[in-house]
Amino acid sequence: MNLSNLRAPRKANEKKKRVGRGMGSGMGKTSARGHKGQRSRSGSRMMRGFEGGQMPLHRRLPKRGFTNIFRVEYAVVNLDRLAELGLTEITPEVLIKHKLAGKNDKIKVLGNGEIKGAVTVRAHKFSKTAEEKIAKAGGKAEVL
């Protein structure tokens, strides 16, 4: 490949189709819109999803599910992250300080990873495996 044999990609230099510029251009009179009908009119744009009067797909399909307004979101922390802290007592304040949870978050501890040594963990929720692993290491899982 040299500068002397570089070429523009196909259709890169093609001119834009100009419609409505006389019969000789082949795109005069109806300007590629055909005769009559909604699409031939000026300012004609069907709304998104319009299917020619047929019931559109988004209205044919049934609505499903709902949003539970009482759902409680938890900040999830795994045991391996708690082990990295190397503390004997872990509270929500400690997790907020180490940026593992937000100020207003409720905390759920999950059992991914191993914890070494007796650790007291205070959180709003624990998974079964997390509770078992903390107890096995000689620690305590306290629910707030």
UniProtKB/Swiss-Prot annotation:
Protein name: Large ribosomal subunit protein uL15
Coiled coil regions, renumbered to chain: none
Gene3D superfamilies, per the entry: 3.100.10.10
Family note: Belongs to the universal ribosomal protein uL15 family.
Function, as annotated: Binds to the 23S rRNA.
Gene Ontology CC: cytosolic large ribosomal subunit
InterPro entries to which the protein is assigned, alphabetical: Ribosomal_uL15, Ribosomal_uL15/eL18, Ribosomal_uL15/eL18_sf, Ribosomal_uL15_bac-type, Ribosomal_uL15_CS
